[in-house]
Amino acid sequence: MSFVHQKCRNIDTVYLGSNIHRLNVPDNLVKWSQEWSGYNPPAHTDPKVDGAVWADPEIDEKTFQPSWNAIDGKINRVSYVCQYSFDPVTLRPLNPIGRTGLSGRGLLGRWGPNHAADPIVSRTNDNGDLEFVAVQRHDNGEWAIPGGMVDAGEHVSQTLRREFAEEAMHGIVDSENLDELWNNGKELYRGYVDDPRNTDNAWMETVVFNFHDSKGLLKNVALQAGDDAKALRWIAVNSNEPLYASHSHFIDLLKESHSH
């Protein structure tokens, strides 16, 4: 895989919610296949993760017997990228893209892949410009596609609809007027996310679907930021607005899919 992650190697700022800086990982030493005998990054798992019902326990806890690279009960531990491997000493899963300069789980609940779903709801405005719904994140103020984590036992299609409702419709999930919109989604991406929360042992993956409102179904729907977001607005795809994590790449895929 030629892709090299950037946002989860940022050493200019501390890791979200902590005072910890990542170890600097040069581009040529990102891949695990590159020998780096002295690699010893700081370890960090946020206190909010420790003991949380939605999170894994520590990897060496005797009662923790996960099925890696598999559907583990209600938890999907399969990576969209590849069969991930493990650190021979700690037995922790290894980020398939490579080193991040931080071990542990950071803010992520699961060892290995942490699955999300990102719905891009789009329309063509009166000027003929393609736009999408974006929300402003509380944690860092960046604009993002509404989305979130797939709950244990939840199907991705449910997550897409639920997350958009929670973040952009003030929690009104069952708006029958929008069934037609939700039933005509197009998958744009399935894979790894260069997310600032990623670590050597826990990382974000997502499925991105586009739901294009070609019939004006949203005209009579009051879109407003939910509790998880600071603000909401439509953003034109050609505005070059800086976006969170890999979301700019997803918008490039949206543009590409509407250019045919």
From Swiss-Prot:
EC number of the protein: 3.-.-.-
Keywords: Hydrolase, Magnesium, Manganese, Metal-binding
Similarity remark: Belongs to the Nudix hydrolase family.
Function text: Probably mediates the hydrolysis of some nucleoside diphosphate derivatives.
Matches recorded under Gene3D superfamilies: Nucleoside Triphosphate Pyrophosphohydrolase
Gene Ontology molecular function, alphabetical: ADP-ribose diphosphatase activity; metal ion binding
Residues involved in Mg(2+) binding: 163, 167
Protein name per its UniProtKB record: Putative nudix hydrolase 6
Record organism: Caenorhabditis elegans
